[in-house]
Amino acid sequence: MAQPSNYWKQDLLPLSILILTLVATECTIGIIASGIITVVNAVSWVQKRAVSITTRILLLLSVSRIGLQSIILIEMTSSIFNFSSYNSVLYRVSRVSFVFLNYCSLWFAALLSFFHFVKIANFSYPLFFKLKWRISELMPWLLWLSVFISFSSSMFFCNHKYTVYNNISLSSNICNFTMELYVAEANVVNVAFLFSFGILPPLTMFIATATLLIFSLRRHTLHMRNGDADSRNPRVEAHKQAIKETSCFLFLYILYAAVLFLSTSNIADASLFWSSVLRISLPVYPAGHSVLLIQSNPGLKRTWKQLLSQIHLHLQSRY
C-alpha cells in the first residue's frame, strides 16, 4: 500500500505476519478474479473481432486492479520487512503507480455504473433520452478522459518529498511486541486533501448513478408487482437481484473511499488497532467488487466455478 504517511518496522513480527497473510489472501483472490475477467473478455474480443463498451470497461477495470493489488501486496511486504526506504526511487515509482491505478480503478468502476444506469434506468426526461441515444459514442471519450485525469492527478505526487525519521514507539499488549512508527515530515493535511480531491469526482458519479439506478429499478419493480399477481415473476426477481448487486457495489465503493481517506490523512496512525484494520480493509473493495462482477455475469461465473473446481480437485489429489 503506497501511502505517503508512514510505514512500519517491527521488532517482533506476529501481528505483521497475520496482517500480511490476510492482505495477501485478499489480493490473491482479487488478482485471480480480475484475471478471469480480463481473460474472458479478451477472448470474447478476439473471437468476435469487435469490442463492446461493457467489455472495454471491464478490460480496463480488471487490468488496473491487477496492477493495483500487486502494488498493494508488494508495498505491504516491503514496508513490514523494510526492503526499501522511503527516499528510494522504487518507493516514488510505487507511490505514483498506486495513486494512478487507484484513480483509474475508481473512474472505470464509476463509468461502468454510469453506463449501466443510462442503459437500464427509465426516466422520462428529454436530456436522459438524448444521453441514452449517444452513450455508446460518448463512453470511449470518457474512458480516455478518465485515464488522462488519473495520470495528471497522480503526477502531483511524483515530486512530493518526504523526510523520514524515527518518531515514536507504540507498545501494544497484542502479541506482546513493540512497533516503531516512522512518520513522514510532510503536510499531511495537504496530501490527504489532494488525494481525496482526486477521489471525489468518481465517488460522486458512482453514488449518483447507483442511487438513481436503484430508485428506477425499485419503481419499476413496484409497477410490475401491481400489474402481475404472480410475486415470483422472473422479471421481478431479476430486478430484485440487480438492486441487491448495485447496493453491494455502492456499499463497497463508499467503504473503499473512506478507507483511502483515513489512510492518507494519518488519522488512525496513533492507534495500532485501527491502523491494522485500515491495512486489512484496503484490498477488500477491489477484490470484492471483482468477485461480485463475476457472480453477476453468467459467463464469468461459469469460468470462476470451473477454476474453483480445478483447484479443489488439485488439492484433493495432493492431500
From Swiss-Prot:
GO CC annotation: membrane
GO biological process, one term: detection of chemical stimulus involved in sensory perception of bitter taste
The organism of origin for this protein: Rattus norvegicus (Rat)
Gene (name only): Tas2r39
MF GO annotations: bitter taste receptor activity; G protein-coupled receptor activity
Protein name: Taste receptor type 2 member 39
Membrane-traversing stretches: 17-37, 57-77, 98-118, 138-158, 188-208, 248-268, 274-294
Biological role: Putative taste receptor which may play a role in the perception of bitterness.
InterPro entries (UniProt xref): GPCR_Rhodpsn_7TM (IPR017452), TAS2R (IPR007960)
Note from the entry: Several bitter taste receptors are expressed in a single taste receptor cell.
Membrane topology value: Multi-pass membrane protein
Location in the cell: Membrane
Keyword annotations from UniProtKB, A to Z: G-protein coupled receptor, Glycoprotein, Membrane, Receptor, Sensory transduction, Taste, Transducer, Transmembrane, Transmembrane helix
PROSITE patterns assigned to the protein according to its UniProt record, in alphabetical order: G_PROTEIN_RECEP_F1_2
Family, as annotated: Belongs to the G-protein coupled receptor T2R family.
Topological domain spans for side Cytoplasmic: 38-56, 119-137, 209-247, 295-319
Region forming the signal peptide: none
